[in-house]
Amino acid sequence: MGGLSIWHWLIVLLIVALVFGTKKLRNIGNDLGSAVKGFKDGMKEGETPADAQQLPRTGTVDVNAKETTRSDSNKA
């Protein structure tokens, strides 16, 4: 008595089919399926390889560069 048997689920399914109709249930199933497919496609678009996410560094770095302050720029 703790859980529902297969017969309980079949009766519930039959009542739901009678209340909503099979056409309405089929439309709901199609909508749900397309929503899940769209979600999966969106998740695949979000995934990119780690190498593609990093931008290539082609610039040079001036090791001897000195930081200019606001007072240094006013002197010029």
From Swiss-Prot:
Report keywords, A-Z.
Cell inner membrane, Cell membrane, Membrane, Protein transport, Translocation, Transmembrane, Transmembrane helix, Transport
Provide the taxonomic classification. Answer: Bacteria, Pseudomonadati, Pseudomonadota, Betaproteobacteria, Burkholderiales
The way it spans or sits in the membrane comes to:
Single-pass membrane protein
Highest taxon of source: Bacteria
Stated role: Part of the twin-arginine translocation (Tat) system that transports large folded proteins containing a characteristic twin-arginine motif in their signal peptide across membranes. TatA could form the protein-conducting channel of the Tat system.
Q: Where is the composition biased (Basic and acidic residues)?
A: 64-76
**Which protein are we looking at?**
Sec-independent protein translocase protein TatA
The listed locations are:
Cell inner membrane
A Gene Ontology annotation in the biological process aspect, one of them, is: protein transport by the Tat complex
Hydrolase as a keyword?
no
Q: What is its main location?
A: membrane
Source species: Burkholderia vietnamiensis (strain G4 / LMG 22486)
Subunit architecture: The Tat system comprises two distinct complexes: a TatABC complex, containing multiple copies of TatA, TatB and TatC subunits, and a separate TatA complex, containing only TatA subunits. Substrates initially bind to the TatABC complex, which probably triggers association of the separate TatA complex to form the active translocon.
* GO CC, alphabetical: TAT protein transport complex
Query: Does the record bear Membrane in its keywords?
Result: yes
Q: Which GO terms describe its molecular function?
A: protein transmembrane transporter activity
